[in-house]
Every structure is written in structure tokens, then in C-alpha cells.
């Protein structure tokens, strides 16, 4: 199977446009060479690290999801029983 040349051109164009966007300091504050001096970037990084640490420290129990999953997985059996006994009865 031959890949069309237009697909190659599209992939290259999208890749170049994405890399140019990331390299522009106005479009991407993380690409700023003085990122350490940027208080917004530092505050964002600290908030992200804190949120990840909290999420990993206190995982939510999976128990509330089990009754919901049991209910959802039983719906096809209930539908089959209703069709068999009430509709086609």
C-alpha cells in the first residue's frame, strides 16, 4: 500500500507548525529562556506538583463504583428477562 505524498506533506507541515508554536515565547511561556524568573510559571508548577502529591497521597476508595458497575452490567440480563417474560410472554 502506497502512502500519498499529500499525507507526507501534511504531517511535515503540522509538525513544523507545532514546533514553531512551542518555540515562540509569546505563545508558550514555558519556552522562555528565563523561565525561573517567571513567577506565574513557578506558581503553576508548584500548584501542579502539590495537586499531584495530594492525589497520590489519598486515593479514593473504589467501593462506591462497585455497586454502580454491578447495576450497569445487570441491565442486559434484566432487559432479556423482560423481553422473554413480559413482551414475548
Swiss-Prot record:
**Signal sequence segment:** 1-23
Would you say which domain of life the source belongs to? Eukaryota
Q: Which residues does the record annotate as propeptide?
A: 24-61
**Which GO molecular function entries does the Swiss-Prot or TrEMBL record give?**
sodium channel regulator activity; toxin activity
Q: Does the keyword ATP-binding apply?
A: no
Q: Which GO terms describe its cellular component?
A: extracellular region
Q: Please state where this protein is localized.
A: Secreted
Q: In which tissues is it expressed?
A: Expressed by the venom gland.
In the record, which positions carry Asparagine amide?
88
Q: What is its main location?
A: secreted
TM annotation in the entry: none
Q: Which UniProt keywords apply?
A: Amidation, Ion channel impairing toxin, Neurotoxin, Secreted, Signal, Toxin, Voltage-gated sodium channel impairing toxin
**Similarity section:** Belongs to the formicidae venom clade 1 family.
**Biological role stated in the UniProt entry:** Vertebrate-selective toxin that causes pain by targeting voltage-gated sodium channels.
- What is this protein's name? Myrmicitoxin(1)-Pr2c
The species is: Pogonomyrmex rugosus
Amino acid at each position: 500500500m502506497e502512502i500519498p505524498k499529500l499525507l507526507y506533506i501534511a504531517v511535515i507541515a503540522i509538525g513544523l507548525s507545532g514546533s514553531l508554536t512551542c518555540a515562540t515565547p509569546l505563545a508558550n511561556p514555558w519556552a522562555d529562556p528565563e523561565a525561573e524568573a517567571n513567577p506565574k510559571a513557578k506558581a503553576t508548577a508548584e500548584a501542579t506538583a502539590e495537586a499531584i502529591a495530594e492525589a497520590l497521597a489519598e486515593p479514593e476508595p473504589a467501593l462506591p463504583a462497585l455497586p454502580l458497575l454491578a447495576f450497569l452490567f445487570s441491565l442486559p440480563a434484566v432487559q432479556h428477562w423482560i423481553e422473554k417474560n413480559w413482551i414475548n410472554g
